[in-house]
């Protein structure tokens, strides 16, 4: 199934993640700690923890950091208790935004998120105001030139729901979140390595931003992503790169 081009945006997203590697480590330590607290420190028995540890490996985080985070979460070491909160809001031209946070101070976090929205042309919404526009799923992206037929066969056999190819040849695979690890392992066993592999909130529809609106929207997203308590930002905005 064909779709519009996402490949440039994926490459841009990867580059931005590389630029923020130090912050990514901090976020992953929080995620590993909370995952271990919620589901235990056994990676084999805790899918959320396994996903976080896999992300840490992809981000070249030292194993000692990962081990300490698991120990803090499972009670082996003292540490901060983080609360998970999701905020919803609107960006430029009403674009939908979800902001996932982990915090030890809810009052501080909501104030910082609200300030970022208002400073850069957005506004906070109420619970449920935009969440219905997104679907929780596993998402994989493969580079142009990947064998689409073989990838599709392996993905669908492993439990993927959808495989789409954009106009540049980049391939997106979508699966239920609980099947993410199984699909990832099956694709790796078949010889496929994803450029990006994440569990995300995927928008049902997208809005393309160009020119000045794209610049304004990117500033808002950057402001939210740069907040210390923010783990993930999801939006239905597609920023066209100049």
Curated annotation (Swiss-Prot):
GO CC terms, sorted: cytosol
Record carries keyword Nucleus: no
A Pfam family recorded for this sequence: Transcrip_reg
Localization: Cytoplasm
Keywords: Cytoplasm, DNA-binding, Transcription, Transcription regulation
Chief location of this protein within or outside the cell: cytoplasm
SUPFAM superfamilies according to UniProt: YebC-like
One GO term (biological process): regulation of DNA-templated transcription
GO MF annotation list: DNA binding
Classification via InterPro entries: Integrase-like_N (IPR017856), TACO1_YebC-like_2nd/3rd_dom (IPR048300), TACO1_YebC_N (IPR049083), Transcrip_reg_TACO1-like (IPR002876), Transcrip_reg_TACO1-like_dom3 (IPR026564), YebC-like (IPR029072)
Family the UniProt entry places it in: Belongs to the TACO1 family.
The protein's name: Probable transcriptional regulatory protein HEAR0561
């Amino acid at each position: 199934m064909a779709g519009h081009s996402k490949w440039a945006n994926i490459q841009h997203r990867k580059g931005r993640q590389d630029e923020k590697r130090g912050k990514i480590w901090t976020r992953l330590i929080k995620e590993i700690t909370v995952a271990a607290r919620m589901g235990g420190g056994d990676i084999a028995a805790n899918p959320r923890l396994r996903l976080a540890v896999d992300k840490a490996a992809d981000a070249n985080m030292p194993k000692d950091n990962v081990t300490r985070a698991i120990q803090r979460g499972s009670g082996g070491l003292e540490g901060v208790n983080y609360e998970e909160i999701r905020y919803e809001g609107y960006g430029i031209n009403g674009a939908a935004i979800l902001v996932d946070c982990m915090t030890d101070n809810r009052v501080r976090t909501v104030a910082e998120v609200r300030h970022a929205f208002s400073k850069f042309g957005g506004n906070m919404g109420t619970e449920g105001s935009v969440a219905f526009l997104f679907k929780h799923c596993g998402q994989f992206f493969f580079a142009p030139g990947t064998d689409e037929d073989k990838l599709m066969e392996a993905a669908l056999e492993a439990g993927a729901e959808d495989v789409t190819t954009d106009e540049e040849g980049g391939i997106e695979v979508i699966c239920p979140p609980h099947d993410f690890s199984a699909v990832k392992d099956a694709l790796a066993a078949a010889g496929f390595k994803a450029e990006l592999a994440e569990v995300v909130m995927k928008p049902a529809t997208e809005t393309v931003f160009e020119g000045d609106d794209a610049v304004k929207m990117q500033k808002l997203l950057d402001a939210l992503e740069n907040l210390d308590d923010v783990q993930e930002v999801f939006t239905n905005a597609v920023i066209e790169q100049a």
